[in-house]
Amino acid sequence: MNNRTLLGLSLLTLSVSTGQAAMAAGEKGEGFIEGSSLTILNRNLYFNRDFRKGQSSSSGNGYSEEWAHGVIGRFESGFTEGTIGFGVDAFAMLGLKLDTGDGRSGAGGTVDVMPYNSLGQAEDNYSKLGGAVKTRFMDTEIKVGDVFPVSPVVHYGDARLLPESFRGVTVVNSSVEGLSLQGGRLHSMSQPNTSSMRDGFATFYAGEVDSPWIAYFGGDYTLNDNVGFSLYTSRLKDAWNQYYAGTTLSYPLADDVALIGGLNYYKAVDEGKLNRPGFRGGLNS
């Protein structure tokens, strides 16, 4: 029996924005300062895994738990006025250990909320600091630096104390009504339990993969209020190529109630260098 408990609580979110107080939802004011925002999120996380009733963990430890608190600060500027606008995004994050101990976390356990030292003990704290410069021309926005991509093939994770981030270049375009295009090339990432901004890529198919870069491109098209389509492709260098097709469907049942569904198809093709027997010939899901 495997009992697993994950409790997350966002205690306080502080948002400070400058500019027009009555700005319409989803819109940002023009100008570097007028369109800027600052958010501070306090997050409390307790993680527990109990293998003592029959099932043993891979590390041989029957009980693991960690309790930690995270503070996540984000600043997003607006864009300077003019044909080409420039801006800056920045973040500072801090993770604090509240309770754990030897044999319950780190290298000797199965929970890795906090980083651990050479003795296998959870660190008392860790931090992340990063940012990106951005530019906007008409309906195209480019970011260079530490970014948080959201797509079916490359997506930052936010299920632990502090979120993941990637380092590289991303581009988003919305010139055509109903169509959003995005792509990027990323050469490293920051895992959720480390201060490093140059970790290897964490993947769904094979865990952490040693690859020099990942590139992706695709788009989402909204046909109407009820139907949408998505097509994406990505390449993890020296590992695999991935392809995605999906639909989103919504059927209104009442003014504020709708039935939501969709179809998702993934195909991953091994480049032949991964050397994982279960991956040869590719995967479909």
Task: Put a short name on every predicted segment.
Residues I40, V71-S77, G131-T135, V169-N173, ...:
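Residues on the lipid-exposed face of transmembrane beta-strands in outer-membrane beta-barrel proteins
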Residues L179-Y205, D210, I214, D256-S285:
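Outer-membrane beta-barrel translocator/channel fold
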Residues M1-G31:
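Cleavable N-terminal export/targeting peptides
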Residues N44-N48, A90-L96, F137-D139, D146-P152, ...:
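Transmembrane beta-strands of outer-membrane beta-barrel pores
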Residues F51-S57, D99-R104, V153-L161, N193-G200, ...:
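Outer-membrane beta-barrel translocator domains and adjoining extracellular loop/strand segments
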Residues Y156-P163, M189, S211, S234-Y244:
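Solvent-exposed loop/turn segments connecting transmembrane beta-strands
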Residues G82-G85, D139-K143, G178-Q182, S190, ...:
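Repeated loop/turn-to-beta-strand initiation elements of outer-membrane beta-barrel proteins
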Residues Q20-P149:
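Beta-barrel outer-membrane channel/assembly domains of diderm bacteria
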